[in-house]
Amino acid sequence: MQKSVFLAAVAGVGMTAGVASAATLDDVQARGTLNCGVNTGLVGFAAPNAEGEWEGFDVAVCKAVAAAVLGDPSAVEYVSLTGKTRFTALASGEIDMLSRNTTQTFTRDVDLKFEFTGINYYDGQGFMVPAELGVSSATELDGATICIQTGTTTELNLADYFRSNNMDYEPVPIETNA
Protein backbone atom coordinates (compact mmCIF):
# COMPACT_ATOMS: atom_id res chain seq x y z
CA MET A 1 0.00 0.00 0.00
CA GLN A 2 1.41 3.34 -0.98
CA LYS A 3 1.62 5.89 1.83
CA SER A 4 1.71 9.63 1.73
CA VAL A 5 5.26 10.67 2.21
CA PHE A 6 6.48 13.89 3.69
CA LEU A 7 10.22 13.81 4.07
CA ALA A 8 11.99 16.94 5.27
CA ALA A 9 15.67 17.12 4.73
CA VAL A 10 18.38 18.52 6.87
CA ALA A 11 21.05 16.34 5.32
CA GLY A 12 20.86 16.95 1.63
CA VAL A 13 17.67 17.80 -0.10
CA GLY A 14 14.30 18.35 1.12
CA MET A 15 10.75 17.95 1.88
CA THR A 16 9.18 15.27 -0.18
CA ALA A 17 5.62 14.09 -0.31
CA GLY A 18 3.57 11.64 -2.24
CA VAL A 19 -0.06 11.63 -3.08
CA ALA A 20 -1.88 9.68 -0.43
CA SER A 21 -3.70 6.61 -1.58
CA ALA A 22 -7.42 6.58 -0.96
CA ALA A 23 -6.94 3.83 1.63
CA THR A 24 -4.48 5.91 3.66
CA LEU A 25 -6.77 8.92 3.58
CA ASP A 26 -9.72 6.74 4.55
CA ASP A 27 -7.73 5.31 7.47
CA VAL A 28 -6.72 8.78 8.70
CA GLN A 29 -10.26 10.11 8.43
CA ALA A 30 -11.78 7.06 10.14
CA ARG A 31 -9.23 7.25 12.97
CA GLY A 32 -9.56 11.03 13.31
CA THR A 33 -5.81 11.50 13.73
CA LEU A 34 -2.78 11.67 11.48
CA ASN A 35 0.14 9.48 12.54
CA CYS A 36 3.12 11.58 11.53
CA GLY A 37 6.70 10.32 11.67
CA VAL A 38 9.19 12.93 12.86
CA ASN A 39 12.82 13.11 13.99
CA THR A 40 13.67 11.97 17.50
CA GLY A 41 14.49 15.56 18.42
CA LEU A 42 15.96 18.07 16.01
CA VAL A 43 15.44 21.58 17.36
CA GLY A 44 13.87 23.85 14.77
CA PHE A 45 12.44 20.91 12.86
CA ALA A 46 10.82 18.49 15.31
CA ALA A 47 11.39 18.44 19.05
CA PRO A 48 9.27 18.64 22.18
CA ASN A 49 9.47 21.99 23.98
CA ALA A 50 9.72 22.46 27.77
CA GLU A 51 6.01 21.63 28.09
CA GLY A 52 6.41 18.44 26.07
CA GLU A 53 4.58 19.83 23.04
CA TRP A 54 6.09 19.13 19.63
CA GLU A 55 7.24 22.15 17.64
CA GLY A 56 9.33 23.01 14.60
CA PHE A 57 9.16 23.12 10.81
CA ASP A 58 8.40 19.42 10.28
CA VAL A 59 5.77 19.55 13.03
CA ALA A 60 4.12 22.50 11.26
CA VAL A 61 3.92 20.39 8.09
CA CYS A 62 2.18 17.60 10.03
CA LYS A 63 -0.26 20.13 11.47
CA ALA A 64 -0.97 21.59 8.02
CA VAL A 65 -1.78 18.15 6.62
CA ALA A 66 -4.01 17.34 9.62
CA ALA A 67 -5.82 20.66 9.12
CA ALA A 68 -6.31 19.94 5.42
CA VAL A 69 -7.43 16.33 5.85
CA LEU A 70 -9.22 16.45 9.20
CA GLY A 71 -9.99 20.13 9.70
CA ASP A 72 -7.99 20.13 12.94
CA PRO A 73 -4.27 20.97 13.09
CA SER A 74 -4.00 19.39 16.54
CA ALA A 75 -5.24 15.97 15.36
CA VAL A 76 -1.69 14.62 15.02
CA GLU A 77 0.08 11.77 16.79
CA TYR A 78 3.85 12.27 16.52
CA VAL A 79 5.96 9.14 16.16
CA SER A 80 9.69 9.62 16.84
CA LEU A 81 11.80 7.82 14.25
CA THR A 82 15.51 7.41 13.64
CA GLY A 83 17.27 7.41 10.29
CA LYS A 84 17.17 3.61 10.39
CA THR A 85 13.48 3.20 11.32
CA ARG A 86 11.76 5.91 9.27
CA PHE A 87 11.20 3.98 6.03
CA THR A 88 10.10 0.76 7.72
CA ALA A 89 7.55 2.72 9.75
CA LEU A 90 6.15 4.33 6.62
CA ALA A 91 6.08 1.17 4.52
CA SER A 92 4.48 -0.88 7.32
CA GLY A 93 1.66 1.60 7.96
CA GLU A 94 2.84 2.51 11.46
CA ILE A 95 2.75 6.11 10.24
CA ASP A 96 0.61 7.79 7.60
CA MET A 97 3.28 10.26 6.54
CA LEU A 98 6.88 11.10 7.25
CA SER A 99 7.99 14.65 7.96
CA ARG A 100 11.64 14.55 8.96
CA ASN A 101 15.08 15.21 7.58
CA THR A 102 15.57 12.84 4.68
CA THR A 103 17.54 13.17 1.49
CA GLN A 104 15.77 12.36 -1.74
CA THR A 105 17.78 9.82 -3.71
CA PHE A 106 17.15 7.81 -6.85
CA THR A 107 17.30 4.56 -4.88
CA ARG A 108 14.74 5.74 -2.35
CA ASP A 109 12.49 6.95 -5.12
CA VAL A 110 12.70 3.75 -7.20
CA ASP A 111 13.37 0.93 -4.73
CA LEU A 112 11.20 2.16 -1.87
CA LYS A 113 8.53 3.46 -4.26
CA PHE A 114 8.08 6.74 -2.39
CA GLU A 115 6.90 9.72 -4.37
CA PHE A 116 8.87 12.83 -3.51
CA THR A 117 7.56 16.36 -3.88
CA GLY A 118 9.49 19.55 -4.34
CA ILE A 119 12.41 20.34 -2.11
CA ASN A 120 11.64 22.56 0.86
CA TYR A 121 15.03 22.78 2.55
CA TYR A 122 18.58 22.83 1.26
CA ASP A 123 21.54 22.22 3.49
CA GLY A 124 25.15 21.22 3.30
CA GLN A 125 27.58 18.92 4.99
CA GLY A 126 30.86 19.74 6.60
CA PHE A 127 33.23 18.84 9.40
CA MET A 128 33.33 20.45 12.84
CA VAL A 129 36.82 20.33 14.28
CA PRO A 130 38.13 21.99 17.46
CA ALA A 131 40.04 25.14 16.49
CA GLU A 132 43.03 24.13 18.60
CA LEU A 133 43.73 21.27 16.16
CA GLY A 134 44.58 23.84 13.50
CA VAL A 135 42.84 21.95 10.71
CA SER A 136 42.16 24.15 7.70
CA SER A 137 41.03 21.52 5.18
CA ALA A 138 39.08 18.27 5.33
CA THR A 139 41.99 16.63 3.52
CA GLU A 140 43.93 16.95 6.79
CA LEU A 141 41.54 14.54 8.54
CA ASP A 142 43.23 11.30 7.47
CA GLY A 143 42.97 8.90 10.43
CA ALA A 144 40.35 11.01 12.23
CA THR A 145 37.62 9.63 14.48
CA ILE A 146 34.28 10.98 13.27
CA CYS A 147 30.79 10.79 14.78
CA ILE A 148 28.16 10.00 12.16
CA GLN A 149 24.42 9.38 12.36
CA THR A 150 23.57 5.93 11.05
CA GLY A 151 21.12 5.23 8.26
CA THR A 152 21.68 8.58 6.54
CA THR A 153 23.04 9.74 3.23
CA THR A 154 25.55 11.73 5.27
CA GLU A 155 27.01 8.40 6.41
CA LEU A 156 27.39 7.32 2.78
CA ASN A 157 28.80 10.69 1.70
CA LEU A 158 31.43 10.52 4.46
CA ALA A 159 32.56 7.08 3.31
CA ASP A 160 32.65 8.27 -0.31
CA TYR A 161 34.69 11.36 0.59
CA PHE A 162 37.35 9.42 2.48
CA ARG A 163 37.52 6.67 -0.14
CA SER A 164 37.85 9.13 -3.05
CA ASN A 165 40.65 10.97 -1.21
CA ASN A 166 42.46 7.73 -0.25
CA MET A 167 42.06 8.55 3.42
CA ASP A 168 41.14 6.46 6.46
CA TYR A 169 38.80 7.36 9.31
CA GLU A 170 37.26 5.71 12.34
CA PRO A 171 33.46 6.12 12.31
CA VAL A 172 31.64 6.48 15.64
CA PRO A 173 28.04 5.59 14.78
CA ILE A 174 25.23 7.37 16.63
CA GLU A 175 21.53 6.52 16.34
CA THR A 176 20.04 9.96 16.95
CA ASN A 177 21.15 13.54 17.17
CA ALA A 178 19.14 14.12 20.35
Where are these regions (language model features)?
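Second-shell loop/turn segments in exported
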Residues: 47-53, 76, 86, 143-148
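N-terminal hydrophobic or amphipathic helices and topogenic motifs
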Residues: 2-12, 20-74
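Short loop->beta-strand "edge-of-pocket" segments that line small-molecule binding or catalytic clefts
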Residues: 33-39, 55, 139-155
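Short hydrophobic/charged patches on amphipathic alpha-helices used for structural packing
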Residues: 25-26, 87, 138, 178
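Acidic, polar ligand-binding/catalytic clefts
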Residues: 63, 67, 71, 75-140
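Short coil/turn segments
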Residues: 41, 103-104, 130-134, 146-154
